[in-house]
């Protein structure tokens, strides 16, 4: 400690650069680290309740709350559904002495481990000390500790994790594991805390009794739609707000007064159509997107009436997050591939999202698709698992279940293509009107590209009763044979999150 304090004293006297310190162990080690924190020009703390204490005990220029976050390069949902899964897990340590509040919580929060025959990874298993031994009823479920890399794999292997809170009153301090699990697509059931409720309300269910904990776990394990929706909400919340890039932006803003780089890149929706009967669906699909920065480029068949085009432009330009609308006109002889390439060349966005005119794209579709590039390492993303509505039979069928969050997918639906513009300039569409999507996929793979099949939410494919409506004229019974029936038209909301 003395050597560190002497080094900080010398650094403060010899350098004009700000000293930034982060105490990630607040509030437990507030007093322990105070002699060090007094040298900081800017202090960041995991517990907002400690801000006044730092202001009273240091001369820091600023004191700011900064919660934990997730490194989505390590903790993410990639390929989670392609691994054999177990049901329920708790990872951590037990203290038979001290930590009375934590011990009380564990007394009821671990009951689901017994009821659902889960697993406990004991962080203190290497210490043969009775102080750290789990109570007798939980010991049959205890497994040895694993290192962090192994734990990140386990995050994806279990359907549900349990969490307890050593700190319950802080509005910002909670286990880092909660962020990492949600980033991995794994729902968490937790004992109550102010931080959990402030940051993950509606995402992390909390329990105050053993029965509540068992009921919350039971619903996640046995209600498939509830599990998937909870998983997707957690991924989105962490990817948008709780990555270390977000925390880095906060540090730059506080220390250097630099505006954060949190503005998301411009995304260009390209849509080629000759069917003006889908006018209202096109407007709704695009205008309801929650992604904050959108450009729209249409490639229209020259049969579209001028007044309809003018109305379309006018309505979309009134949407606050749509920054530019551009219309390109083409003769009937132009191929679909040619029109798409022209729209992409005109695009100013970093990302290109290909929309079809007759499918449904729900509000968080574009936001979630672009977030996948934060962690997937993909060159092109889309959906291989998605619901299709068969108009003739009013059936909703989930196509290709089990291919969600799949990196290395050989296929994604053309109507769901999202890629950086640079990739689609490297692998442009062929001059054809059928099979142009599959051709891009094949050439992408041949060029060493990585294709990511994302979640199955917020997009529903439309199959008309008359197959002549589609360029791919597969009969409806093909979809029913190769997919899984999941409802009817009234069940669309099950696939929107």
Question: Language model features by range: what are they?
Answer:
Residues 284-293:
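Short, acidic, metal-binding catalytic loop of nucleotide-sugar glycosyltransferases
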Residues 249-285:
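N-proximal low-complexity "stem/linker" segments adjacent to membrane-targeting elements
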Residues 352:
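Short aromatic/hydrophobic "clamp" motif used to bind/position activated sugar donors
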Residues 364-395:
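Conserved donor NDP-sugar-binding/catalytic core segment of glycosyltransferases
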Residues 1-3, 42-179, 187-196:
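Nucleotide-sugar donor-binding catalytic core of glycosyltransferases
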Residues 330-347:
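Glycine-rich, basic loop-to-helix element that forms the pyrophosphate-binding segment
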Residues 225-255:
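A charged, aromatic-enriched C-terminal amphipathic alpha-helix characteristic of glycosyltransferases
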């Amino acid at each position: 400690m003395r050597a560190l304090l002497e080094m900080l004293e010398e650094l403060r006297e010899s350098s004009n650069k700000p000293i930034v310190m982060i105490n990630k162990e607040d509030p437990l080690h507030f007093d322990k680290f105070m002699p060090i924190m007094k040298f900081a020009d800017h202090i960041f703390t995991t517990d907002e309740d400690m801000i006044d204490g730092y202001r009273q005990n240091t001369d820091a220029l600023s004191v700011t709350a900064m919660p934990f976050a997730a490194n989505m390069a390590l903790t993410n949902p990639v390929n989670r559904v392609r691994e054999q899964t177990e049901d329920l897990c708790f990872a951590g340590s037990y203290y038979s002495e001290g930590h009375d509040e934590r011990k009380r919580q564990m007394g009821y929060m671990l009951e689901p481990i017994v009821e659902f025959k889960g697993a406990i990874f004991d962080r203190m298993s290497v210490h043969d000390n009775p102080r750290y031994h789990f109570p007798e009823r939980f010991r049959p479920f205890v497994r040895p500790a694993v290192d962090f890399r192994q734990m990140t794999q386990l995050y994806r292997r279990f359907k549900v994790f349990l969490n307890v809170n050593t700190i319950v009153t802080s509005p910002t301090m909670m286990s880092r594991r909660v962020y990492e699990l949600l980033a991995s697509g794994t729902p968490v059931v937790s004992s109550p805390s102010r931080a959990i409720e402030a940051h993950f309300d509606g995402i992390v269910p909390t329990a105050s009794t053993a029965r509540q904990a068992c009921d919350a776990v039971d619903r996640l394990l046995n209600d498939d739609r509830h599990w998937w929706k909870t998983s997707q909400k957690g991924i989105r919340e962490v990817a948008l707000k709780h990555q270390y890039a977000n925390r880095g932006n906060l540090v730059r803003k506080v220390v250097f007064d630099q505006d954060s780089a949190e503005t998301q890149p411009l995304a260009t929706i390209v849509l080629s159509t000759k069917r003006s009967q889908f006018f209202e669906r096109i407007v709704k699909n695009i205008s309801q997107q929650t992604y904050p920065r959108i450009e729209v480029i249409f490639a229209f068949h020259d049969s579209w009436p001028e007044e309809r085009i003018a109305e379309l432009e006018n309505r979309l330009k009134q949407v606050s997050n749509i920054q530019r609308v551009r219309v390109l006109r083409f003769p009937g002889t132009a191929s679909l591939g040619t029109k798409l390439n022209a729209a992409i060349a005109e695009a100013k966005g970093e990302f290109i999202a290909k929309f079809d005119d007759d499918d449904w794209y729900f509000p968080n579709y574009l936001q979630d698709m672009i977030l996948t590039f934060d962690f997937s390492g993909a060159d092109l993303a889309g959906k291989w698992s998605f619901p299709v509505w068969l108009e003739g039979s009013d059936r909703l069928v989930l196509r290709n279940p089990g291919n969600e969050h799949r990196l290395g997918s050989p296929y994604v639906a053309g109507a769901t293509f999202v890629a950086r513009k640079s990739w689609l300039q490297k692998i442009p569409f062929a001059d054809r009107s059928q099979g142009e999507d599959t051709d891009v996929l094949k050439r992408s793979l041949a060029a060493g590209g990585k294709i990511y099949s994302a979640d199955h939410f917020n997009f529903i494919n439309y199959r008309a009763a008359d197959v002549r409506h589609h360029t791919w004229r597969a009969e409806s019974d093909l979809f029913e044979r190769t997919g899984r029936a999941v409802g009817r038209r009234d069940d669309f909301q099950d696939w929107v999150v």
